[in-house]
């Protein structure tokens, strides 16, 4: 596929410039401004000496700036590096060194840790700080807002679809490792996921521009609320990439803790169509909040919700049934890892859910401990 993330989003920004691209709390960024701000930050990265294949870390909480910074890295032909905001100094040094990062975006609340590690990372050319209401403790940084004011937007360029997209593992099976994909091939995987969810995706993805015009005419864009961190594959791939690749909206909250009532209120306020979570850890408190609201005589308005998507942790049959009792929607349970998606199951009121039962994706095989290839279900 001769496509890459930044070029797709540039095309979309030209078609629906006034539509919402990013929402975080009460801050709304249009597609026009998403492209413009990303282009200005891309200029800042180039001015710092970054270029094609340069790596840049995203040491950020969920925010519009996370997605703007990532797009800026894509625009220069670079490689964004997801950084776990829970890491301590030693882990941060390892990850940023292992990834060959040349720049780091970080929220001001992490500035003391940046100050602690900066001397151990001589290859970092730019530390870009994003204000979050906390006091900065690191002086040698570029300020995100000042860059938006001072930088001209970078001119659009042709990019290689074989440019790497990389996501680092969480480190649960050893030190974090970067899993690499060619952007063009990874986009094929993402569009297949959208097709499996029932979205009208053209057979030839290079005809995507025509499809975006159709979405515009019918006003059928996805609006996805991302309940989990963007630093992990579930939040980024299923929560942000899927809606943005079809000209939709990525909705986040700056709150670090999970508040189910705040989430359902945000669903009502933004008219969310999709919700992305991580199994029962999210779904159970979400169900409890719905039950409480119903018992109080003030149920949440779920009429806009079409699908809840989960990956990463078990999503039990009992909790799925409870959610379906409140609203008729699709529940999509996906099985995968940083290395790729392997299977999924879809539940509705007409197709009752089961716990941990999946249909494997095309191209997936099952291998026994002795190397023998097994038939699914055998």
Feature locations, PLM:
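Conserved beta-loop-beta connector loops within the AMP-binding
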Residues: 365-378
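Conserved pre-ATP/AMP-binding loop-to-beta segment of ANL
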Residues: 150-168, 174-175, 213-223
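Gly/Ser/Thr-rich phosphate-binding loop
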Residues: 246-248, 272-277, 287-353, 363-365
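Conserved AMP-binding/adenylation subdomain of ANL enzymes
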Residues: 187-227, 231-276, 289, 293-294
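Conserved AMP-binding/adenylate-forming core of the ANL superfamily
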Residues: 18-63, 67-71, 88-93
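Flexible, low-complexity linker/hinge segments
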Residues: 1-3, 135-163
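Conserved AMP-binding A3 loop
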Residues: 30-32, 164-204
